[in-house]
Amino acid sequence: RVSRKTWEELRRLDIGGGQSMLLFDELLEMLQDTQHHLYVETKHPSGQGDILEEQMVLRLRYAGLIDDPRIHIISFSHHAIRRMQNLAPHMDRIYLRRDWERHVNRPDVMLSKPTALGVSLLRAKLQPAIIGAQGLPTYLWTVDKPEDMKWAWANGVDMLATNQPEVALHAIEL
């Protein structure tokens, strides 16, 4: 488990392509002089409780990015979305709906106030009307095939998560 490792142990890990992990501060520093957006997913439940969001806001404030529109918080947790609304009300907050929620929450009731709603590719294809629901932008994950990227583009998806950014750029140019 990652939570049981020291930073030194984590830093030595190869996370792919010879890359090592970064501290959040290092990632924020890399973002400073770019036009890139950063989507930060908070994982819950965590052994850290509310400290996770508090520390994230502290680090973003320290980096001068607390009100930067390029920073987006994404989470499957309504609690995390509510915490971020209280701690950083101007920050973009994307609630990620789980696929099983389509069975137990048919009216799509929100227990928090996200600024955008996330949905999986599977759910979006099963329920295309969910794209743009409640008048909010839609974040779609994880879209790696060009035909799915084109489908998302044609159906009004606002943000797309992919493991294939080069493919995405080519797919939307066509």
Regions of interest found by a model, annotated:
Residues R1-D92, S112, V119-L122, G132-Q134:
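Metal-dependent phosphodiesterase/phospholipase catalytic core, i.e.
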Residues Q19, I94-L174:
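C-terminal active-site rim and adjoining tail of enzyme catalytic domains
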